[in-house]
């Protein structure tokens, strides 16, 4: 049985330009033919946070473009969303966009580090880590990062730690390679 839904590639080709004009790129498209009504999920990300107002605008544009297809069918659910906090950071752009949050890294040697994402430069990530009572920046080559997951925080970060992550400098800090 066919639902008349477009393929993942067709959705990306159809919506990609509209999302790019808004400053976002399509990270993934999931088409669930088994759901009733069928569901098309578009996951987008950009250098600025995908807020609810932007999601609404993108959803209206995407819905209009999808509805213009001849074979789309009468009923489907469209969902436009961001990747979510639990998405692993897998590319340089993910780290660049995630500057500031706390992250747990697993390195190629099996060691684990938890720190705050700082600047990304020349294939390396600045990670703000605790060094006794102070904060320091540790430079981590991206090639050594096996896994990186942003951590959910329930309390505000230390101001000095956050300043170091977002500006790259704070009083009483040093950079370690």
UniProtKB/Swiss-Prot annotation:
Keyword Phosphoprotein: no
Cross-referenced Pfam families: DUF150_C, RimP_N
Coiled coil stretches, renumbered: none
Alphabetical list of InterPro entries matching this protein: Ribosome_maturation_RimP, RimP_C, RimP_C_sf, RimP_N, RimP_N_sf
Record keywords: Cytoplasm, Ribosome biogenesis
GO cellular component: cytosol
Location relative to the cell: Cytoplasm
CDD domains, alphabetized: YlxS_C
Highest taxon of source: Bacteria
Entry's Gene Ontology BP terms: ribosomal small subunit assembly; translation
Task performed by this protein: Required for maturation of 30S ribosomal subunits.
Family to which the UniProt record says this protein belongs: Belongs to the RimP family.
Protein known as: Ribosome maturation factor RimP
Species this protein is from: Mycobacterium ulcerans (strain Agy99)
